[in-house]
Amino acid sequence: METPFWKTKTLEQMSPAEWESLCDGCGKCCLSKLEDEDTGEIYWTSVGCRLFDAQTCRCSDYANRLARVPDCVGLTPQNVRTISWLPSTCAYRLVAEGRDLYWWHRLVSGSAETVHEAGISMRGRVKASETDLAEPEDYFDYMLDDEP
């Protein structure tokens, strides 16, 4: 059996298709996060981006997301090593740290549904869309105690 590409290649060596396939579809990147201006600490919310599809846990306009959502962060092999808010379960983060993917990742399980079945994704856990919130202070109502 051939060794999986994420165990043999660096992030920089991956093809665009391999890179995109690393996304486990959890949807956590698409949640609004709050940053404490004094400490830099990141606080998670249950507020989804305006383009977030809460059923699929994917972007509804992935190809145009960076143009349509100014705060959207396009992940690259370079920035996944420095973005502190990437979830601890994020495949990009795991591979960058030299760790293996979890059993529920679609590249391991063979199914895009296992991330949902394992309770890792945000399916059913997003409580609002950023389009629902009138004031910046409204985000505080959706703060989570920990990383989802």
Curated annotation (Swiss-Prot):
Pfam short name (any one): CxxCxxCC
Classification via InterPro entries: Puta_zinc/iron-chelating_dom, UCP006173
Family of the protein in this entry: Belongs to the UPF0260 family.
Protein name in UniProt: UPF0260 protein mll2411
